[in-house]
UniProtKB/Swiss-Prot annotation:
Record protein name field: tRNA dimethylallyltransferase
UniProt record similarity statement: Belongs to the IPP transferase family.
UniProt entry tagged with the keyword Cell membrane: no
Domain of life the protein comes from: Bacteria
């Protein structure tokens, strides 16, 4: 089997998705040993510089084994949208293919996968002044109150969002205040991810057969992050002076909980932080799995299998062979 020129073969995009802590990085590195791939990160947290521990960012040694793209793009004070991701990912994928290699999209930000597969509606750009005003309102009124306001002007979107989903409530109200139109009016009405495979694309999904295994792994990984210095990392971010708890970067799982723990006292209550961080990560994993179940064309590998990475490699070889034979 050879995929040295994937643009001429039947498969031009390979995706590796799964919930947080499912072993995507290890599987991607295993794939890089046998296929001519370059990794395109599909992770909304990895775009931020200076956020390494809490994002489980691939190490310098791991990134030296295979080229990685869309990591460390912006400062954590900046915003990064799904539309920006699509533009950056498409550019990176075209460059990878031009080098005769295969783009390997790896991550768990399912909204980014949806935007790339299904396209993204032409939403108005972010308005920093409006966002700042909404942040200020949230600090005095609380996000549930703003969610209630959203329900009066855009009940369709509000019904999809939790009252404390600050980032999405903020964006929906920002669109309403900027345009006078509800966010839901910009969408085609279909919020699920692609139910049919995009052309020349294959998706391997790492999913647990035992949810308890994933929960245990999440707890162990968050404990390891604390041991590795997550609290110190958040202290450094707080000391910059240009960040606050309502920024998208600081709402990332782990960072949000560590920031709140430091607000409550320094040194923080590490036992409570461990419990809250692991719980938030479990909720994230649940949402990711819900998205993945809406993609019936995916091919699954049990992430709790001892040889999960080897199974991913074998399946990827099979998928490439199948597409080459059909081309």
């Amino acid at each position: 089997m050879s995929v040295a020129s994937p643009a001429a073969a039947g498969l031009d995009t390979l995706c590796l998705a799964g919930p947080t802590a499912s072993g995507k990085t290890a599987a991607a590195l295993a794939l890089a040993q046998v296929l001519p791939v370059e990794v395109v990160s599909v992770d909304s947290a990895l775009v931020y510089r200076g956020m390494d521990i809490g994002t489980a960012k691939p190490s310098a040694a791991e990134r030296a084994l295979v080229p990685h793209h869309l990591i460390d793009l912006i400062e954590p004070c900046a915003a990064y949208s799904a539309a920006q991701f699509v533009a950056d990912a498409r550019r990176a994928m075209a460059e990878i293919r031009a080098r005769g290699r295969l783009p390997l999209l790896v991550g768990g930000t399912m909204l980014y996968f949806k935007a790339l597969f299904d396209g993204i509606d032409a939403l108005p750009p972010a308005d920093p002044a409006l966002r700042a005003a909404l942040d200020a309102e949230a600090r005095t009124r609380g996000w549930p109150a703003l969610h209630a306001e959203l329900a009066t002007v855009d009940p369709v979107t509000a019904a999809r969002l939790a009252p404390n989903d600050a980032q999405r409530v903020q964006r929906a109200l920002e669109v309403w205040r900027a345009t006078g139109q509800p966010l839901s009016s910009f969408h085609s009405g279909r919020f699920d991810v692609a139910s049919a495979a995009p052309p020349r694309t294959a998706l391997i999904s790492l999913e647990p057969t035992d949810r308890g295994w994933l929960h245990a792994r999440i707890g162990e990984r968050f404990a390891a992050m604390l041991q590795a210095g997550l609290v110190d990392e958040v202290r450094r971010l707080r000391a910059r002076g240009d960040l606050h708890a309502d920024l998208p970067a600081m709402r990332c799982v782990g960072y949000r909980q560590a920031w709140a723990a430091l607000d409550a006292g320094d040194p923080p209550d590490l036992a409570r932080l461990q419990a809250e961080g692991a719980a938030a990560t479990r909720q994230l994993a649940k949402r990711q799995l819900t998205w993945l179940r809406g993609m019936p064309w995916r091919r699954t590998v049990a992430c709790d299998a001892p040889d999960a990475s080897a199974q991913v490699v074998a399946l990827a070889r099979q998928l490439v062979d199948e597409r080459e034979a059909a081309a």
